[in-house]
Amino acid sequence: MILCLSFLLMIGFSLIAEGFSFIIPKGYLYAAIGFSVMIEALNQLAQFNRRRFLSANMTLRQRTTEAVMNLLSGQKEKAELDADTASLVADQDQHPLFNPQERLMIERVLNLNQRSVSSIMTSRHDIERINLSAPEEEIRSLVEKNQHTRLVVTGGKDNEDLLGVVHVIDLLQQSLRQEPLDLQALVRQPLVFPEGLPLLSALEQFRQARTHFAFVVDEFGSVEGIVTLSDVMETIAGNLPNEVEEIDARHDIQHHQDGSWTVNGHMPLEDLVQYVPLPLDDKREYHTVAGLLMEYLQHVPQWGRPLRLTVIPCARCRST
């Protein structure tokens, strides 16, 4: 644009000069045009190098996310405005375009495909389960004290094989019909997700299969944990407390008056960075605070050992 205006000005100036019988050597005109072209080329090269430097360590998705979040942040770029234009936009600058909660949810949606199901799953060690051959009294006792809508059914010699899932409502209906509780007849097969499946793909599979429950398996086919549709939705909306007022370990974080934080070891790092600024390595093989500590220490952390994060007591070699 600037180059075109320069050409027009030079051509117009030469025509006006010729109209007043002033003779301007063409060599000066050509030199001015060549100089303008060279300056514009250097300007474009400088802008290209600057953009390449700023985006060298960022993927296209990350750059797009950052651009959208900058747009939604409500922080307008500084620009020189005349008095009339400034008076028109003065009132708009007093209020942000989006409130913080809206910006946070939009950012989570944009990052949805960069998180895998293993980062939000419930570990198999924390799964409420029941043996396929359990007596009816044990089933009733577990249903009475359990507040979940589904129970994972296990079998095998060591009761470690996850066979499927039973809906508590099915057990209730079976009981209302005065029938003996039969887990074998009620077991349903959930979806099976590889541990590296992106959340966006998991959400689509949940929608197509019309089920809200899935096993997460590793490359060897071993079940590492479970994930539900509610888990995926919590990555967008934040923690959704249940009726029994249980504190989900993945959202168990407390801010103290002295500025310190108490964080559950099961909390995903992607959720932690919403509260505590923390650089994350995209190539890391861990997803939780406990994984971060074990990667840093190369052993099970000890209670109260001073680090950048303070670890609370461990149970059975697991950071809690």
Swiss-Prot record:
SUPFAM superfamilies: CBS-domain pair, FAD-binding/transporter-associated domain-like
A GO term from the CC aspect: plasma membrane
InterPro entries for the chain: CBS_dom, CBS_dom_sf, FAD-bd_PCMH-like_sf, FAD-bd_PCMH_sub2, Ion_transp-like_CBS, Transptr-assoc_dom
Keywords: CBS domain, Cell membrane, Membrane, Repeat, Transmembrane, Transmembrane helix
Membership in a protein family: Belongs to the UPF0053 family.
Membrane-spanning intervals of the chain: 4-24
Localisation per UniProt entry: Cell membrane
Protein name: UPF0053 protein in cps region
